[in-house]
Amino acid sequence: MEKKMKLFRICASITLVLLGFVLTNTPSRYFLFFNTPEPVEEVVKVAKKVDPKQLACLAKNIFYEAGGEPINGQAAVARVVLNRITHGFGSNPCNVVYQSTVVQKENDEGENQKVKLCQFSWVCEGKGEPNKNNPKYVQASQIAYDVLAYDAYNDVVPKSTLFFHNATVNPAWPYQQVKTIGNHTFYSNKKKQKKMNNDR
């Protein structure tokens, strides 16, 4: 019995020595039961408070200007409105969307008449409230909310992008073209560089 106890103690000692060696020379990742998970850094965007009136103005502009465009095209129109705020076109989306001016213009009879010019054509056309259940308006509203609440799609066009037009027309704008998305071509506020005349 005594011999068995001595043998047991020897075996136990050897086992502990070997276990200690393994634990001190083996990376801890192989012993999951000793590990504590490494903290994962998670970026959580907090939604900004959105004014329903401003949301409606931006959503209507997206809907009327780009309702049939791809999501990026609609988002680009929304970003143009926000870019204009930072460039002094207005202090909020509604100011920018409904910005207009009245000018004197000569009609076909040679008479001067007052003409209202709008930043966005649908405003001058007097279009009213869209059908809130229209799937395209629902999508436009979601894009508008994401842009206002989370600053979403902030890389779809540069922050200098302030203008756009339908790609089927070709106005003589002096601005640099940024990109075309769907049926809209977007421009920055930077003037086109004049071509150097190298003829001698």
Region spans (language model):
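Hydrophobic membrane-insertion alpha-helices, especially the h-region
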Residues: 9-26
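Short, Lys/Arg-rich N-terminal segment immediately upstream of the first membrane anchor
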Residues: 1-8
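Bacterial extracytoplasmic/cell-wall-associated proteins, especially those involved in peptidoglycan
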Residues: 22-200
